[in-house]
Amino acid sequence: LAGQAVELPAKTSAFRDWAERLRAFAGDGGLDGELAYWQGQLQGASSDLPCLDPLGDQSNRHARSVSCGLDAEATRQLLQEAPAAYRTQVNDLLLTALARVICRWTGQVDALIQLEGHGREELFAEIDLTRTVGWFTSLFPLRLTPAEGIAASIKGIKEQLRAVPNKGIGFGALRYLGSAASQAALAGLPVPRITFNYLGQFDGSFAMEEGALFVPAGERAGDDQSPDAPLANWLALNGRIYGGELRIDWSFSGERFEIASIQRLADAYRDELLALIAHCRVAEGQGLTPSDFPLARLDQARLDQLPLAPCEVEDLYPLSPMQQGMLFHSLYQQEAGDYINQLRVDVDGLHPESFRAAWQAALDEHDVLRSGFLWQGAFETPLQVVRKRVEVPFSVLDWRGREDLAAALDELAAGEGRLGFDLSEAPLLRLVLVRTDEERYHLIYTN
């Protein structure tokens, strides 16, 4: 369009190369380690749904659709506010609401859902799919088990979603490309009757005010499949955000479900999603889950005993061997002060507030400067705790004209050293800036 020569980047892997590599990988047992996981998702699961006629015709000619959605403000809250409470993604909340509504509808304790993934997983170092044209979508089942309360439901389903290996691509590969034993093991298990797919935000792709070349057409596109072709599933949910509003379309066969029944279900889903958003926006609606800190290897029970508010915690991870030794000696030989370091310097022409702001910026940037330790109670294995935000301990004293200045500075520094640190409280440093003359300051930095 600009009249310039087209320069294309290097070609990425072909769809055929990917397909052949995946077939060989699955056939050679490369995904057999996932088989037990997928069997666990399906064995004993119920796929029954309340319907008009379980044998009703599933062809496209009987396709019906209802929808539900959120207005712009509720959608903004879903995208920008609600995820912070439990460190979730939008999909976590959408599926939590769906699982709770489906379980109430069916009377079951869990909901068997088929999910879609983009399928472009990085399984092979020699395969690059970043610019490869093709339909790689992977389908996989997940048995979601909501709890009675909203908080426990969000945490539990978030963890179930994080536990899916390789983002679900292994199920289809094992079911259709794996060994004969793997295919047989999965073939006779229940099949999800509900498919859920959240397509994401389309506002950025079709931003008319930014001069997008293509925008959605207002007219109907016509049928994209034969009327005799089967529908994708008993219930197929497709969600997207466009024009700042979330919309979920529910597709089904009118021979199998009543339109009014599915519309009530869709409305119940919208109400449940609004309840989840409202819960996440209040202070008590907050929590951490084990997948937030994989290196810490904590279960939910111990994580719930953290002596910090969830919103204060940036990260948790084990101590290095050297840190473990230093912590041990610091705790059992507290009077020795072997690991207390101190730096004292005289500085001319310093601006105290700018100096404090520079230190605060350093703490904001570097995790290690916002770190403390946990070792008591449920945390028999010490952990390093990185806080999201800490204020730099910074004090300024004006001792201009003091006759005993040298001795007073020595005593002040010694007192700072004797004071030590509470190793559970970050940051493990203090700065004292003493003004000793009009343009001179004495800095005592203790850590």
Where do the language-model regions lie?
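Extended, hydrophobic beta-loop-alpha segments that form or line the acyl/peptidyl-thioester binding
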Residues: 1, 109-116, 147-154, 171-172, ...
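Short amphipathic alpha-helices and their capping loops
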Residues: 2-4, 9-64, 292-334, 356-407, ...
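His-Asp-centered acyl/peptidyl-transfer active-site segments
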Residues: 11-35, 81-95, 99, 104-224, ...
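Short beta-strand-to-loop capping motifs
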Residues: 70, 144-146, 250-254, 345-349, ...
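Surface-exposed, Lys/Arg-rich phosphate-binding patches that contact polyanionic backbones
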Residues: 72-88, 252, 361
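Short beta-strand micro-motifs enriched in acidic
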Residues: 238-242, 374-376, 434-436
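Conserved catalytic micro-motifs used in adenylation/nucleotidyl-transfer and phosphoryl/amide-
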Residues: 435-444
